[in-house]
UniProtKB/Swiss-Prot annotation:
Species for this entry: Clostridium botulinum (strain 657 / Type Ba4)
The protein's name: tRNA (guanine-N(7)-)-methyltransferase
Binding site for substrate: 127, 159, 196-199
Free-text function comment from the UniProt entry: Catalyzes the formation of N(7)-methylguanine at position 46 (m7G46) in tRNA.
Similarity section: Belongs to the class I-like SAM-binding methyltransferase superfamily. TrmB family.
Keyword list, A-Z: Methyltransferase, S-adenosyl-L-methionine, Transferase, tRNA processing
Cytoplasm keyword on record: no
Length: 217
């Protein structure tokens, strides 16, 4: 589904201190941007911010960067964080958002700058000629390895079984060890799950969610 252009979105996100409008200039300087030396975690394809806003609230000593392609999506993620701030009556200084094509992500983060990556319900790109666009594909995992620290974990959730099984091979081929895996997350023994908007919707439909944790060797 193609998003309708919202002309008001760009001015709104640029007015927010949660938005980094020149991310390439921050390469190697993200801790300075956050004004601390805390670990930095990424959510790739953060959508409307339901997931990352919960992380930011729970973990004030971790910095987060949410990435999505469209201004029309990020604007709602910023609003979601503001809503959460109002709810808990506390300003979150540990979150930034950027809009970009993730294919160019290694231009934004430097070696050993990132400590964890979350990938939730990304586009499965089912046609074989489009597989390289998958956020878990070996092509992109190679890019992530340019800026993640040793032993970094990638947490991956999806409702698409073909993507999930292909991704297991992508991780193994790219030098990651799969440390946890389940084909039914909500009925598993994994207790650290935070639900996304999609996940809550899928749960009401009785759909099973697949999840894995992969660690860079």
């Amino acid at each position: 589904m193609r998003l309708r252009k919202k002309w008001w979105a760009r001015p709104e996100i640029e007015a927010s201190d949660k938005f980094a409008d020149e991310p390439k200039e921050l390469r190697g300087k993200w801790n300075k941007k956050f004004n601390n030396n805390n670990d930095i975690h990424l959510e790739l394809g953060c959508g409307r911010g339901g997931f990352i806003s919960q992380l930011v609230e729970k973990n004030k000593d971790i910095n987060y960067v949410g990435i999505d392609l469209k201004d029309e999506v990020i604007v709602y993620a910023i609003r979601k964080v503001k809503e959460k701030e109002e709810e808990v009556k506390r300003e979150f200084k540990n979150i930034k958002f950027i809009t970009m094509n993730i294919m160019g992500i290694a231009e934004v983060f430097d070696k050993n700058e990132i400590s964890k990556i979350y990938i939730n319900f990304c586009n499965p790109w089912p046609k074989e000629r489009h597989n390289k666009r998958r956020l878990t594909h070996t092509k992109l995992l190679t890019e992530y390895k340019k800026f993640i620290k040793p032993n970094t974990e990638i947490w991956f959730k999806t409702d698409d079984k073909e993507l999930f099984e292909d991704s297991q091979e992508y991780f193994k081929e790219s030098g990651f060890n799969i440390e946890y895996i389940t084909y039914d997350l909500h009925n598993s023994d994994f207790k650290e799950n935070i639900k996304t908007e999609y996940e809550t919707k899928f749960e009401t439909m009785g759909m099973k969610i697949m999840f894995l944790k992969a660690r860079l060797l």
